[in-house]
Amino acid sequence: MHYDKNKTKQTEKRCLDALSKYGDFKMSEDEYSPFDLYGYTNNVKTLIEIKERSEMWDRWYIEKQKIDNLRKLKHKTKDPLRIYLMIVVGNDGFLFKVDDIFQMGKIERIRMNKQTSKDFPQSDIKIRKEIINFHHQLNLLKLKLND
């Protein structure tokens, strides 16, 4: 999938709007942050990473390193911290607890293109990556996002 910075920011804003009734969230200003939204729910600091997908699947795949990076943040603080992954498909947002993904997901090592197939359709550069494969029914909450 080709990275479109404007579309990504629009998706983050849509998620921010949909989550406003659950807490006070802001968009991360750091482009390289491991999370996209941060704020508080019931006075507990909350971080949310957003991933957009083009289709709905029974099982989702995410790089294990992304989940590990989010979990490290939780272990670095003594304060309570909630960390979620939100997968967006069209106008639906699915919220998952990162700890649930780690505990209930299946870790696999797969070979994948180093670059996206859209940007480099003939790429034969393959690397091995660890991914976590988890069921969509692990989601805690399904949100409707506005256009």
Predicted regions and their residues:
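Acidic-basic catalytic patches of nuclease active cores, encompassing PD-(D/E)XK
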Residues: 1-29
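Ribonuclease/tRNase effector modules and their secretory precursors
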Residues: 2, 89, 144-147
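Conserved catalytic cores of phosphodiester-cleaving nucleases, focusing on short active-site segments
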Residues: 19, 37-54
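A structural signal for short, well-ordered beta-strand segments and their strand-loop junctions
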Residues: 27, 47, 84-87
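Beta-rich catalytic cores
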Residues: 33
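Mg2+/Mn2+-dependent nuclease catalytic core
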Residues: 53-76
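Nucleic-acid nuclease catalytic cores
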Residues: 75-101
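Intrinsically disordered, low-complexity terminal regions enriched in charged/polar residues
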Residues: 94-147
